[in-house]
Amino acid sequence: MLEKQSVNQKEQYNFNKLQKRLRRNVGQAIADFNMIEEGDRVMVCLSGGKDSYTMLDILQSLQKSAPINFSLIAVNLDQKQPGFPEDILPAYLDKQGVEYKIVEENTYGIVKEIIPDGKTTCSLCSRLRRGILYRTATELGATKIALGHHRDDILQTLFLNMFYGGKLKGMPPKLMSDDGKHIVIRPLAYCREKDIERFAVAREYPIIPCNLCGSQPNLQRQVIKDMLRDWDKQYPGRIETMFSAMQNVVPSHLNDHKLFDFKSITHDSDIIDGGDLAFDREALPLNPVGWQPEDDEDTEKRPSVRLDVLEIK
């Protein structure tokens, strides 16, 4: 009995630290990018996946202690995919006491009608979904649209654009929507996916599978995701360092002449951004920048977590 109590206490201790870390990361991202302001009505896009559940959960938690007043409304888009469990999200949100709206639009039927069998449907589906969510935000009077992308998503997008698009372009934590009417925010921008996975397991969210439409996963993104996960295991701190690099950009030391005016550099110019070592190697720190060992006692022993996804029959 004492041993069981000790295990439960340790689990609760680790969960509390995990929740605190997620709260801190979300709070810091909100502050750094001024994501949420006094009086904001934040439309939280809820898909039924681990990321959006966690985002809503943490925002609710922060709302209680925030120095500003803001409201939340969860929005789910029921795209009429076969087998979509329509009762799951309303039941969960009613239990949480969250204001919400379920938007029913048969985008699945539109996509199936336009895209031939066997072809990827994600691009068209995404455009349709985006337009509906923008319209819904206007109808609800939402001042911000919150999406559940996390740090790993941002890094994956950076490498996708580098490897396949020839661009140094990631996924911004805050942006103006492509229709020019809405501000989109990503409160989980500083959060690690593995933290979100552990949190979702502990909270026992009713996870809805993401492939009800039958579409194949993005193979390019999966390759990048696997690469980053391998690096995270083999080279602790590399992911944190790369993310830090995205926040410490030095345009004068890149090659984009549209971003920095190299042509104006003359013998009369001042040293720019510390100059360059030119002939010498730059001394780098022994430990990766931005990395600290995880503080959970059983990190090394902890097995990979597995989310219990609802079985749709």
Curated annotation (Swiss-Prot):
Molecular function terms, GO-annotated: 4 iron, 4 sulfur cluster binding; ATP binding; magnesium ion binding; sulfurtransferase activity; tRNA binding
EC number of this enzyme: 2.8.1.-
Matching Pfam families: ATP_bind_3
Protein localization: Cytoplasm
Cofactor: Mg(2+); [4Fe-4S] cluster
CDD domains: TtcA-like (cd24138)
Positions occupied by motif PP-loop motif: 47-52
GO cellular component, one term: cytoplasm
Residues involved in [4Fe-4S] cluster binding: C122, C125, C213
Subunit structure and binding partners: Homodimer.
Function: Catalyzes the ATP-dependent 2-thiolation of cytidine in position 32 of tRNA, to form 2-thiocytidine (s(2)C32). The sulfur atoms are provided by the cysteine/cysteine desulfurase (IscS) system.
Protein name per the record: tRNA-cytidine(32) 2-sulfurtransferase
